[in-house]
Amino acid sequence: MDKTAAAQRIKWLSSEIERHNRLYYEQDMPEITDAEYDALFRELKELEASYPDLALPDSPTGRVGGRPVAKFTQVRHTTPMLSLENAFTEKDIVDFDDRMKRFLGLSGAEEIGYVCEPKMDGVAVELVYRDGLLAIGSTRGDGLVGEEVTQNLKTIKDIPLRLQTEEPPGLLTVRGEVYLPLEPFRKFNQEREEAGEPPFANPRNAAAGSLRQLDSKITAKRPLSIFCYAPGEVDGVAFQSQSDFLSTIPTWRIPVNPLTRLVPGVQGVLDYYNEMMEKRDDLPYEIDGVVVKVDRFSLQRDLGEKSRSPRWAIAWKFPPRQATTVVNDIVPQVGRTGVITPVAHLEPVNVSGVMVSRATLHNWEEMERKDIRRGDTVVVERAGDVIPAVVQVLVEKRQGSETLLPVPQACPVCGGEVVRIPGEVAVRCVGLNCPAQALERVKHFAARRAMDIDGLGEKFIEQLLNLKLIRNVADIYRLTEEDFMQFERMGKKLAENLLNSIAASKERELSRLIFALGIRHVGEHTAKLLASAFGSMENLAAASEEELTSIREVGPQVAASIADFFKSEENLEVLRELKEHGVNPRVEEKRVGGRFTGKTFVFTGALEKFTRDEAKKMVELEGGHAAGSVSKKTDYVVAGADAGSKLDKAQQLGVRVLSEDDFLELMQ
């Protein structure tokens, strides 16, 4: 391939991969398989390696991280990134509104338009686009000078490397907040603890630590997101107001928090704040208040700035989620992977409306670093529905009777050997028959997100283990009505309901069973990827690490953990027993060499003779792929009544269109 052809191919591959990224991550409608995507990605990387001068500045290969840097360079912001003045009460906001009106010479009856947005608890950054391309990304730093973290920011899928507009401004500087959503944060911390690494105290610390990695490949593995909220220096486009700016940049694919709103006057601000307070615990990310800004930029210029903050904006903070209490005891707790965690038993205290009586101390290294002792007076923090944590010891309140909990020399439950693997902070029980591990494994297996065995709660599982009616998850399926009738307050109807729930779990999806097994580093999302890729437990158990890492989003650490799980004879015996007891996960295996192998179908319109799900399964059983949108790679569009734009696009592209009867005939 000559250089001209290589340049054209690189441009096409970059555009095509970015399109597939949007389909996969934003619309959940992939058009190609992981293997096909990986082939495109590999080809682009190889071409860029052969012709490095042809690599585009917004190449999707930049999202997986570049070479590690020795240290961060300093970047001066185009305009200062100022702090915000804080408000804590309704009166503070009313006073703020009064000040705005006085400065602007407005009467008390006149209303100012304010833009309100959730105050993200993340890391402030600045993105600089030149002629539509992301040129520089930096942290806030001291407000005047920050650290250049462009390569790390490029790994965040929410950030466009090129603005999606035919006429980009010559210069666009955007400020935003990088954050780690709560569910990925919990999963990330769980994986760190299982790997023997110290967990992050909160999502903000995790986001900050991820952004400041010298190796951007590490940042790329962390599910960071961003919301942008303000312009810096701009050239080539004129925004009239904050709301004008925030309604324009999403059309260029720059993300803005959808909860941002223009409200009329101070009452609008008060109503918005109360609404966000109610929504706070239901949001998938942490917020710690509301930011209020005068909307019109002309008014902002008139109001000006103080030395450290603009006059035209204020941050109204939520009430603290912290409280002071006493550590009554510190108790070691054994998890399903054998990790022993110190847990603080607290004098019950109300933290933002929730009674807290326990808090994780994570591990002994963390507990020793914070110097937490029995009898200490401590500050406890609760963030969303994240497990409460001890964030500070009030050393000045010590009486001298406080005691440390030493690292256990034996498992506190089974008395088995305890080890500390080099490079890990976790202390682990390695006893194969540890009942505490068995309890946690069975709890996890029966949980709603796993096998969903209704009625099989912690106390009941504990009793089953104590009576030796079960020893592992497979034994659940041996249980009989007679076994259940041994328990107090267990009537015949309740026993029947439990047995029905256990029986129903035998037909759960394969991904649920994979997740339920509690394989280290395998969460719900990874379990779905594995189920889709391998189609059966037998295929997964036989997979090599190389085959596992060929799946997008499965890295070497996860692959090694899966392979190790299936090397264990004890685990294989449990799987054999599950199969013997009739646990038969729902699997739709693709037919190799089926009549639709390599073919892509799109279904549109109102289907009368089958549902979309039924049609999708029919196609997949014959080796085909059902996509959500029409492209040049679509082979067939099956059109029902009132088919719309997808049918039009199919006709434009010359894709073969089938009726429902045509499709059923093709299936014969």
Curated annotation (Swiss-Prot):
InterPro entries: BRCT_dom, BRCT_dom_sf, DisA/LigA_HHH, DNA_ligase, DNA_ligase_AS, DNA_ligase_CS, DNAligase_adenylation, DNAligase_N. GO terms for biological process: DNA repair; DNA replication. Its cofactor is Mg(2+); Mn(2+). It holds the Pfam family DNA_ligase_aden. Gene3D superfamilies: 5' to 3' exonuclease, C-terminal subdomain, 6.20.10.30, BRCT domain, DNA ligase/mRNA capping enzyme, Helix hairpin bin, Nucleic acid-binding proteins. The keyword Zinc applies. It catalyses: NAD(+) + (deoxyribonucleotide)n-3'-hydroxyl + 5'-phospho-(deoxyribonucleotide)m = (deoxyribonucleotide)n+m + AMP + beta-nicotinamide D-nucleotide. Keywords: DNA damage, DNA repair, DNA replication, Ligase, Magnesium, Manganese, Metal-binding, NAD, Zinc. NAD(+) binds at residues 34-38, 83-84, 117, 140, 177, 293, 317. The active site is at 119 (n6-amp-lysine intermediate). One of its GO terms (cellular component) is cytosol. Residues 591-668 form the BRCT domain. Its EC number is 6.5.1.2. Belongs to the NAD-dependent DNA ligase family. LigA subfamily. HAMAP family: DNA_ligase_A (MF_01588). DNA ligase that catalyzes the formation of phosphodiester linkages between 5'-phosphoryl and 3'-hydroxyl groups in double-stranded DNA using NAD as a coenzyme and as the energy source for the reaction. It is essential for DNA replication and repair of damaged DNA. This is DNA ligase. It comes from Citrifermentans bemidjiense (strain ATCC BAA-1014 / DSM 16622 / JCM 12645 / Bem) (Geobacter bemidjiensis).
